[in-house]
């Protein structure tokens, strides 16, 4: 990449010809013959200087001058000619020396301007003398004078300007000055510029810079002090006194007590230099100094005049034949322009003079600071002022003075030779020049450009950086370190992209937010450096750290289904196409969080890069099997099962973990042409029709309108201990029941059991056993319950049932399938009017022949058939519709208990059995008299389920349970005012929670269903509801109750302020309307006294403001309280339950449809939807759908104790019958 150059101003034809002719002549001449030529001032003497490295700007040169003393003293060399990369880092740690110059040019000139000798009239030379002074040096007394040489340097700046080229060839913007070696100096410039010889011991640094556009030349020379420490020691106090005493012996005029001060001695020294410098012309008379001068002999070392100052000692002229003695004659410094030897002496005199002024002024300051009695009067010092302003530098170069900025000394700014206040165009120009001249270090310059860009925040620079295909040196090293690599030990160009990606994936998801940012930036840098598009792709589409950010970006709630997210994604892209990549990242984030194949498919379709980099054809079949970790001989359903396990529960090793799994399964599905696998990949749902029957639970046909019974039967089937008990029930079980020692005394539900109930219950278990056997052994995808089972499940326990033999049962079953009923009314149509369930059956379901247990592969038992008419069945179903699910569960479980042999009896003779162990817990209720808290009356009650209400508007399941277990204050006739506390003393293995959703509308005189969402999670902790003596937990419970009461009071006040009156106005709205009325002038129009209207309006404004402030305060307090409450009990999570069944009702209070979701912990935690004869897999998001307005609402939740999931819950149990 070459540096861009500003175009030169156009020359006219005559000018171009002149420049060309001169250039040709110059090229044809030897260097020795240049003395015969005259520079026309129109030709670039250094046409190739732009290729010289390094280059610097005038600001950089100035700063280099000021920091060079540090480098000279520490390393013995200057930085003037060095590339900035070599010293920029050290520079930012240094304090530059002060660059001072003399303001007054009358008594002592420190600047000279004269015409060029080779091109007079067009080219000019300026010379400026200044001092570099250590800012940290301050003499403490007069004897510190000999330390001065260590703390300052002389600076000489020579600038040659070529006015013609300045006018016609100068580029716009910051000028670039390139280093020129002294031996390359053009002969024309050698004749014009006096350069100290390198062998001169006083010269410590000499640098030449030439501008590329106009060949303006800058000569920088840093020179040692003219007086060394030994010289200045002559002006220590003791030396001054010694010299003065010696002079007193020689000159009687001197007063031995009037010893001159250090400043007086320096003043005399200054006057020696001043006179030769002020001589104007060769005709001017020399100011001779007598060798017998009292001041000279008493204040300085007279030998210096001839040995150091180029004076000559001569005899005094003879007058009247009398020779008075000897005198010192100063050197002739007039012809300094043409005579370089004279110029050298004159410049030395100028440096000596400035040096003496600097030291003399310090000496006079010390007189004041030390309070000496004698104060020196020396106008040559007091009238001379040094300035630290750098304006002269920019004036002499004819450049704009740019005020410095703190960023300017940052090494990145230094490396580009830019200042913070440079315009973007100049910064880019400097960068391009640097990389053109120093390609090897382009990465360093790009680092610098990026830093400058970030510091300035310039859009133009940001855009420019973005277009550069360069990786910065620091960026690369930082990236390597993020990846655990030592930049000094590794060649980054040899890195393997896949290895870097593996590292990135393995660390990303377990890193903090800041670490993720570092990883992402590092991968981007390495991807760019290695040219890996896949690495850059991973960076661009990295999922958001917080999934909530993705939901917010797509403007959806986290509870919505995948198809809603797809819709939101599509709409957002249509509205803002420029943000598509952000929306891609958002849907990718959500897909990973939900582990949703559907959303990943959407992303793959909409973002081809995902399909490009995770294409199933990029891996082999064997590699695909290895990714899923499955044997090649495994069947499709086994492969899918293993895949689902890894998909749902595998450790997310990186953001592409699921993409790799999906890619592997796609390869297998494509290779095997598997309908099952390919359907799953397309939908994310297992197509049950493609599965072997033995790998999926059987559905249950709807034989009429069995409401929620099918869901209950599936639910009971999944509970392994209960299912095993039912499957193993036989005549021996019934006989054991009769023989039990507890049989005659036992009670079920607190009452005695009749023989008829017992017979009925045994038959119910037989029929349930046969259904469960069918569900296990059938070769079909669904089974049909007998009408006896349906009838007995719904019929109340007090309804007597007549049983016949098995032959009758088969006939009755067949009659039921053909819809032949005793009542001529169409029962099917009647049922459909009551419940939507019947609509789910598209045609009459063919019921299977009733099989005895022997036909199912087990021993035949005494199964009897209930004699049930169609009317009886319909009436029983109507009873079932009027029951809630818990009544049916109670009826079914009661029959199971009645048919069970008692394990033991409670004190109240209540039977203890498997059902009690699985489903029943125990509630402890304490009645505490308000006036006598010691007299606690405790009562224990069994519970089958806990009832929570949506009418209380709980925000989640915990909030609902809190209402159930909250303390109540009652007035009882027997005890008076009491506090009732409720807690759990014993929990069941299977915890059931009923959600009350049906309420009665007293205005419409009809029931209605509440569809208010009640969020719940997969885990429920019951610690806070247990009967406990733990003081910490009790204190937390008490605080929780107090906070909730406070929250309730705040919300009640909020509702009151926001409530509307009969015309729909809130209190604030009413006040506003009142104010408008008062302001309308209606009262005045009707001659009603309105004197107090202004005060009334003012008062209304106060009320309105008070309402606003109170509502704001209420909102903040409610928010804070809800946050505090939600974080309570975080330490009490020892008694956990896992959700495994969710019963759903869709519809209204008087009609609807039922199904159940059941989780299979043994099959990767998948959720299945049991919808009568259909059993399908569903995404977890469908189960936990708490969308407002959703009429498919959970009404019954079932949890199992944590740690007992595998042993208690087994949804899939299939052993197929052998086909003949």
UniProtKB/Swiss-Prot annotation:
Pfam families named in the record: RPT, UCH
Entry keywords, A to Z: Hydrolase, Protease, Thiol protease, Ubl conjugation pathway
Source organism: Kluyveromyces lactis (strain ATCC 8585 / CBS 2359 / DSM 70799 / NBRC 1267 / NRRL Y-1140 / WM37) (Yeast)
- Origin organism lineage: Eukaryota, Fungi, Dikarya, Ascomycota, Saccharomycotina
Q: Gene for this protein?
A: UBP2
E.C. code: 3.4.19.12
Q: Does the keyword Kinase apply?
A: no
Residue span(s) of domain USP: 698-1202
Keyword DNA-binding listed? The answer is no
Q: Where is the active site?
A: 707, 1153
Q: What does this protein do?
A: Has an ATP-independent isopeptidase activity, cleaving at the C-terminus of the ubiquitin moiety in natural or engineered linear fusion proteins, irrespective of their size or the presence of an N-terminal extension to ubiquitin.
Q: What is this protein called?
A: Ubiquitin carboxyl-terminal hydrolase 2
Hey, which family's this protein in? Belongs to the peptidase C19 family.
Q: Which GO biological process entries does UniProt record here?
A: proteasome-mediated ubiquitin-dependent protein catabolic process; protein deubiquitination; regulation of proteasomal protein catabolic process
